[in-house]
């Protein structure tokens, strides 16, 4: 009998092994490649939801570890709101405007709360310590205004959490379920989340201590996904830090199935691989964090991704705008270059 395969997973991986994305950067003219590729990549995201008035409401102000914080509620869509945490540097003076960083969270129970420094329980402290996760809080202490919202399916916007608990997910990942819903409407989770992030950015730019001309974005893991898409979709972003979200879809996606509906769009891999997506941000400044001991995105293929991004930035005559923080930890924020990087470019 011929050698047969009954595993769909093996089928997809073998497809990936022989696949070359149609618009993978081949070393040609960068400007022509970017001009042709970026609109096609954006089209894979589908429709973006309509924008609505923000109707901001300040819920509470407090101070934590010297950092003044605010919790706001804003409307980010016709049928959906988001809670927003804003952190201000301890040395912020009246009338002063500061560079501002969008601090995007990744997967995890607590969403934006950990990134913005909520260490109010042993479980929350453990997550922050394990991932060096409170970069929104740390960057505020370093002199930047920072802010964050929850993405769909995580933190306060997860339907498994009170007070809006829904048990019908049956243990399935809400990221995948929301993606299925979104595609039925011709959208994607990325297009919806990006729109919600842009709404939050619109609001924060109205605050008197925010300089709207000096915006950056950073995020770990799934937050790295959203950092990348925010950077590509929102021209206001002057610099970006992608933390532990470098790899090849052939490996972390098709082989390891280490992705979800929050990270994908129909036909995206037909067009580009992850290093191509990162390279499309050129020539703007990009800092990439890679953990040597990362068991989520293996250092071997993470570095292969980074070397491809290096070639794209070189073709864009922007090698000096690409930086690497290679650090000896697990899946986490390196945090060794972030302050200087954003201090230089914002």
Per-range role (PLM):
Residues 209-221:
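Alpha/beta-hydrolase fold nucleophile elbow
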């Amino acid at each position: 009998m011929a050698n047969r395969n009954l595993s769909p997973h093996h089928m997809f991986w073998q497809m990936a092994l022989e696949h070359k994305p149609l618009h993978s950067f081949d070393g040609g003219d960068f400007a022509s490649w970017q001009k042709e590729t970026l609109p096609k990549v954006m089209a894979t995201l589908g429709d973006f939801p309509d924008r609505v008035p923000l109707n901001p409401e300040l819920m509470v102000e407090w101070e934590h570890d010297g950092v003044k914080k605010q919790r706001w509620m804003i409307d980010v869509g016709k049928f959906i709101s988001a809670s927003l945490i804003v952190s201000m540097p301890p040395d912020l003076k009246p009338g002063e405007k500061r560079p501002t960083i969008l601090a995007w969270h990744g997967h995890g129970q607590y969403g934006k709360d950990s990134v913005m420094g909520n260490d109010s329980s042993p479980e929350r402290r453990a997550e922050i310590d394990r991932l060096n996760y409170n970069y929104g809080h740390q960057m505020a202490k370093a002199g930047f205004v920072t802010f964050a919202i929850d993405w769909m399916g995580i933190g306060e916007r997860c339907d498994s959490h009170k007070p809006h608990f829904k048990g019908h997910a049956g243990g399935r990942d809400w990221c995948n379920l929301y993606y299925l819903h979104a595609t039925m409407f011709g959208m994607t989770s990325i297009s919806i989340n990006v729109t919600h992030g842009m709404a939050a950015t619109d609001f924060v730019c109205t605050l008197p201590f925010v300089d709207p001309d000096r915006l950056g974005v950073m995020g770990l893991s799934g937050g790295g996904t959203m950092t990348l898409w925010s950077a590509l979709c929102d021209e206001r972003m002057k610099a970006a830090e992608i933390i532990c979200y470098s790899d090849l879809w052939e490996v972390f996606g098709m082989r390891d199935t280490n992705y979800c509906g929050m990270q994908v769009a129909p036909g995206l891999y037909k067009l580009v691989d992850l290093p191509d997506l990162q390279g499309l941000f050129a020539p703007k400044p990009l800092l990439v964090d890679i953990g040597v001991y990362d068991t989520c995105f293996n250092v071997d293929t993470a570095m292969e991704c980074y070397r491809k991004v290096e070639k794209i930035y070189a073709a864009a005559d922007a090698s000096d705008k690409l930086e690497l923080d290679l650090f000896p930890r697990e899946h986490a924020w390196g945090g060794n270059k972030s302050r200087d990087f954003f201090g230089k470019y914002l």
